[in-house]
A protein has these predicted regions:
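Acidic (Asp/Glu-rich) sequence patches and key acidic residues
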Residues: 1-109, 113-118, 128-129
Length: 129
């Protein structure tokens, strides 16, 4: 089995080296955070509904992009739906870099509420692992 190397283009705010955003403290990953935020029953709990859980996650205006490597993860808080990944040996066509103003507003509101500073911008990064 080989090593995967991916290029990632995403619109968001880089968290910086050795930085996991404060709102992520106590959670295993961003999906775990979203599941807690949703208030829906979690996997294994009575009433858990995967379809509702997935719908909540996909409708949330923010996503987290991990880059660098699995051994040394770095994060970008991103506007959901802006991430494009090109794996080694493949090219992806970028047809538009426009980001919907409503999505940007919802993203900025989330960042303000969670103490994430900076302005979103297009970031090109890589993932090795």
């Amino acid at each position: 089995m080989g090593t995967s190397t991916d290029a990632i283009l995403v619109y968001g705010i880089e968290c910086g080296e050795d930085c996991v955003p404060e709102f992520m403290e106590g959670f295993d990953d961003f999906d775990d955070y979203l599941d807690d935020l949703s208030g829906l029953p979690k996997w294994g709990e009575a009433g858990h509904d995967f379809v509702k859980q997935k719908a909540f996650r996909e409708s949330f205006p923010v996503s987290m992009t991990m880059h660098c490597s699995y051994e040394y993860p770095m994060y970008i808080v991103a506007v959901r739906g802006t991430e494009t990944i090109a794996s080694r040996g493949y090219a992806n066509e970028i047809t538009s870099i426009a980001v919907d103003e409503e999505k940007i507003s919802a993203f900025k509101e989330f960042c303000e509420k969670n103490g994430i500073e900076g302005q979103p911008k297009w970031l090109l990064c890589s993932m090795w692992g």
